[in-house]
Design a protein with these regions (language model features):
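Catalytic domains of carbohydrate-active enzymes that cleave complex glycans
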Residues: 1-148, 152-154
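Residues in well-ordered beta-strands of folded domains
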Residues: 138, 163, 176
Length: 184
């Protein structure tokens, strides 16, 4: 969260000593619903361009596998292992938190979610992205966040308010944007 050069250098030092490939994405889902921080950091550093597609694909695999486990589960009652439903839970938020909010996954047992951005749907008057709107946080720097917003609706306009920080703890000093429409 500090975004200092010294902290970034610490990350690079750790990466240099790591025996694992920091670009790898694996379709796994533990109790933390996390584990891809290194690959996400490499994406933010501009060194893992296809990370968004790969983490979304891995997440889809996790969801499909967990839904199959739930469908195949014939047990009833309360005599399950203490982690029975945790193992079969198809909800996975890691990719969406990283890619749309610009944040690492929160700690699974109650940690606060510290994000760079949050969204407010002005038409529905509720937090979150409007229907048919995609967001990708492409870069995070100490004084700059780059997010790409795309309206995927073929015929409806969408409006949203882009806010700084999950709790309003950040401020936008300036904003720049560009827009374009599809040519097809």
């Amino acid at each position: 969260l500090s975004m200092t050069d010294a902290d970034w250098q610490r990350i690079e030092t750790i990466r240099g000593k790591s025996a694992t490939d920091w670009k790898e994405v694996h379709p796994f889902h533990g109790k933390t619903d996390a584990g891809h921080e290194a690959a996400w950091i490499r994406f933010l550093a501009g060194d893992n361009d296809d990370y968004p597609e790969r983490i979304l694909h891995a997440t889809e695999q996790i969801v499909r596998r967990r839904l199959a486990l739930t469908r195949e589960d014939t047990s009833v009652g309360t005599r399950h292992h203490v982690h029975h439903w945790q193992w079969a839970n198809p909800v996975s938020s890691e990719a969406l938190v990283q890619l749309t909010l610009g944040a690492p996954q929160q700690i699974y047992n109650g940690g606060l979610l510290h994000t760079r951005l949050r969204y407010f749907d002005t038409q529905r008057r509720c937090p979150g992205l409007p229907a048919d709107v995609a967001a990708l946080v492409e870069k995070i720097e100490a004084e700059r966040t780059v997010v790409r917003l795309v309206n995927l609706s073929g015929n409806e306009t969408r409006e949203l308010i882009l806010q700084a920080g999950a709790f309003g703890e950040h401020r936008f000093g300036t904003a720049a944007w560009s827009s374009r429409t599809s040519v097809w």
